C-alpha cells in the first residue's frame, strides 16, 4: 500500500528512467538541425572525429547525444527511416546495459543500430545476436548499408563458414550472428592448438535480439561439442522391445496402500515429465532382460555391473511414453529431427543426449547414430555473462523481469509505444472438450473470412496445426500452414499473412522477427521487381507505384474489417509466449484483436487447473458446445501459468548454481590453455610440474622427516627406473654416507631428473623441445578435461540421492566436484611429466613423430558434432528439495556411463565397501539388498 502511494507521487522506477532518457532525447533533437546541414562526407567524417575524442579520454556516455543524432541522420539518408523519439530511448536503454521491452512493430532492428554504432566507436567489437541465420543475414545486409555509410565495417557470423571468413567477421566493428554460433566459436577457440586459429576477440558488448527466447527459453540447454563414443546400437534395438511389454499404472500408491486405480509396471508424471518403474515393473524388466541374456538369472538391475542397462531401460521407456512424433520430433529422410518446443521450428543437427535420441531412433526404426562424448560445453547463461556489457531487446520481457535481474543483473525498461495501441484482447473461452473448442475456432475463422479480416491461428505443436488444417479443409476455408515442415516458405507466408481473408496457422512463434503488415508486405513484392533485370527502369517504377496504390486500398480494407485477428488454440506454459502471439496484432497503432480458445483436455488445464474449472462448469450445468467466458477462470489459468513459470525459474536457477561449479573450473582450464598458447617458452611450467611430481614419488618411499629404517629404497629405485627413466643407486649413496637425510635424497633425485631433462633438450634444441612440450601439455589437458566433464555428469546424476542421507546435495556436489578437479590437475602434472621424462628422441623429426603418435592416442575424438541439446524432457525433473537438479540435468549432456576410459567404468563393489550411491551405508545394507 505504501509502495503504491509513493509510486503515485514519484512515479515507478520505469517511469522515472523514461523521463530521464526523454531529457537526453531533447538534447539529441536540438542537434538535429545542425546535423542535417552536413554533407555526406562531413557526416561520415564524424565517425573519425568521435574515435579521436574517445582516444583522448572522452566517455561514450558523453558522446551519446551527438553519436545518436549522427546515426539518426545517416539512417534517414540511407535507409529512408528516421528513428522515432521512443526508438532513441530504446537505444539508450541498450547502451546502458539494460533490456528494452518494445512492442511488436516498433522497429527493434533499427533501435539496435544506435547502441551498436556508439559502442563500435571504441574499436573493441559489438555483437548483435539473433535467433536464426536468416535474421542475422537479413539484418546485417539491411543495416550494414547504414554502418558502411558511416565508415564502420560489418561482419556476418554464420554456421559452416570458413575459418578466415569467421576471423574477418569478428574483426569487423559490428558482427551479426546467432547465439549458437557465437557460443560454439567460443568453445572452438578454447580447443585450438595455435593462437592464430582463434577467431573471437575478447567479449566486449552484445545486443541480444529476442532476449527472452535466448536468455530464458534456451538458458537451460547447453551448447555441446561432442565426439563419437562407444557404440551401443544393438542394445538400443534390444531395449526398444521392452516398453510395449509394460503397462502403465494409473494412480500413485499412498502410505495407507490406497490410491492405485489400475496396477501396472510404470508410473507417468506428466507434470514433471518423468517415468518411473514400479516394483512389479522392475521384476518384469529383470525377467525379460534375463530371458534375452542381458543380465544373469536372479540379478538385479541395480547391481553395479548393470547400472548402464538401467540407463538404457529408462531411455527406452521415456522415448515411448514422453516423446511423441509430430509433437516433440518429426521423422525425415530416415532421421529423427527435434522440434523446438518454443518456436515450433525443426532443429536438424541437434540431438537429445543421455541416450534418449538413440532410443527414439530405435522406436521409429530409423538408423541409430552412435552416442557422443562431450568435448566442451557451456550454457548460454554462462556464455553471455562473460561479456563486459550485455543488453537485449524483446516484445515481452516484463513478465520475466525478476529473472533477468536475478540471473544476469539486467534491468528491464518498458519503452512507450510510438502510437497508442488499439488491439482488443477478448476474454478466453473455455470448453469441456477439444472437439467443442475446435468447432468454436472454425466458427470464428469463418466469420473473419466472410468480413475480409486476416486471421493468424497459433497452435502449440505440429500435430495440432495439421489437425486444424484438416478441419479447415473440411470446412472449405483456404489457408496457409506455417510450421517446422514449411520452414523454407516461412518468410513468404508471414509477408502475406496480413492480406484480406488470409488464414495462417502457425506453431508457437514461428515467423518471429518478421512483421505482419496489414494489407500484405509490399516491400517484399517491390524487391522482387527491383531485382528483375529484364524489366526496364521506367516500367519498374510504374509497377512499384501500382503495387503501393493497391496496397493502400488493401490496407484500408483490412483496417475497416478490424485488423489482424489472433486466435490462440491453447495456452502456453508461459504467459510471455501467449503475449508474443497476441503481439503480432496491433503493430504501430493498427487495429487488431485476439482471443484464446481452450479446452479442459489441454495439458496446462488438465495438470494445473482442470479440476477447479470443471467444478465450475458442472455447477453451472453447462450444455455441450457452451463456453465459459469469465474473469475468474482466466485468472485461474494465469495463476497456473505463474506456477509453471516459477517452477521453471527455480529449475533454471538450480541448474545455474550447479553449472557455476563447472563454469569456474572451465575458466581455470581455458585460462591455462590460453597462457600455454601465448607463452614463448613453457620450460619453467614444466620444471615446476616435474619437481612437484618427483617430490610426490620420492615421499611415497622416503617420507619427509623420517628415519632410515622407514625408507623403502629398493622400491624407490625400481619406480624411478621403470616409470621415470632415472637409473640411480640410492641405496649405495645412503650406504656411503653416515648422515644423509630424507631431504638430501629428494634433492639428489630432483637434480638427476633435471639433468635427464636437459640432456633431452640438448639433443634437439630448446625451440623444438618447447613446441613438443606445448603440444603434449595441451593434448593431455584436453583429454583429461573431457574425462573430467564425463565424471561431473556422472556425479550430477546421482547427487540428489545424498538428500536421503540428510546431506545438502548442492554442497556435496561442490565439494566432490572440487576434489575431482584437484585430482584432474594432479593427473595432468603426472601425465605430462611422465611423457617428457620417458620420450626417447635423437632428432627434431623424431620429436614431431612422437607428438603425432600421442595426438593419435589421446587427441580429439572423431566425428565432432555441435549440438544445442533440447531440454524439453529434462526441464521438469522437479522432485522435492535437492532432488530437482539431478533429473533435470539428465538430458543436458551425454553422460559418462557408456564412455570408454576411467570416467565411464563401473567397478565391482565389495559387500562391506561403501555403497556407490553415496548414502554412506555399507553396500550390503543399501543397494546390495536388492541383489
UniProtKB/Swiss-Prot annotation:
GO CC, any one term: plasma membrane
Database matches in InterPro entries: Helicase_ATP-bd, Helicase_C-like, P-loop_NTPase, SEC_C_motif, SecA, SecA_CS, SecA_DEAD, SecA_motor_DEAD
Pfam family, one: P-loop_SecA
Cofactor annotation comment: May bind 1 zinc ion per subunit.
Location relative to the cell: Cell inner membrane; Cytoplasm
NCBIfam families reported for this sequence: PRK12904.1 (NF009538), secA (TIGR00963)
Family to which the UniProt record says this protein belongs: Belongs to the SecA family.
Protein name as annotated: Protein translocase subunit SecA
Organism this protein belongs to: Burkholderia pseudomallei (strain 1106a)
